[in-house]
């Protein structure tokens, strides 16, 4: 099941890579603004944290000042996001077949597809939220409390993309209080 899932994700990534390279889809207004930010890195911007600018800076440093450079890490994040959802479903105790479909639905959901094509802040934010959830569920699976430093690392990374990830602390603290008083 895992091999099939990885193959489908690889085919999705290859197809969307081809779309980014050959379809001639120019940068949208938000992407152009984020790209402008990436040329002058800072710790924050008037409406967003710096993660998207740093991500675009890294992509353009590796792949040049092209649409692919701007969008490359978004495609990587979205593929890893679908795989993280698959792992989360497995760790939560779902059957492998159900976990397969969970990951596939994430990969081909509107956010999974649009987030693969365009440099938006939601992809990095959601990847980090899922990583924090995976950390908590894995600890619960072992009948332990999740390490706050690891969860905090995921929250810190997610806060570089969108500030609402700070809400995860509330859920995490409730989880610790209810399951490990």
Description of each model-found segment:
Residues 1-18:
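Start-transfer (signal-anchor) and selected internal transmembrane alpha helices
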Residues 85-108, 126-127:
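Transmembrane-helix signature of polytopic, membrane-embedded enzymes
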Residues 90-93, 132-149:
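Membrane-interface transmembrane helices that cradle and orient dolichyl/undecaprenyl
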Residues 149-153, 164-179:
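Transmembrane-embedded, aromatic-rich helix segments that form part
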């Amino acid at each position: 099941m895992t091999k099939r899932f990885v193959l489908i994700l690889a085919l999705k990534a290859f197809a969307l890579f081809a779309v980014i390279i050959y379809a001639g889809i120019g940068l949208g207004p938000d992407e152009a603004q984020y790209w402008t930010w990436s040329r002058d890195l800072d710790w924050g911007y008037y409406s967003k944290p710096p993660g998207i600018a740093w991500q675009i800076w890294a992509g353009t440093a590796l792949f040049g000042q092209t649409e692919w450079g701007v969008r490359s890490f978004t495609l990587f994040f979205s593929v890893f996001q679908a795989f993280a959802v698959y792992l989360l479903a497995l760790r939560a105790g779902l059957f492998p077949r159900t976990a397969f479909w969970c990951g596939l639905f994430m990969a081909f959901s509107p956010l999974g597809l649009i987030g693969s094509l365009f440099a938006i802040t939601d992809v990095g934010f959601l990847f980090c939220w899922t990583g924090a959830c995976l950390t908590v569920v894995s600890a619960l699976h072992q009948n332990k409390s999740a390490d706050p430093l690891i969860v905090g690392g995921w929250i810190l990374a997610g806060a570089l993309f969108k500030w609402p990830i700070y809400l995860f602390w509330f859920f995490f603290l409730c989880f610790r209080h209810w399951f490990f008083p």
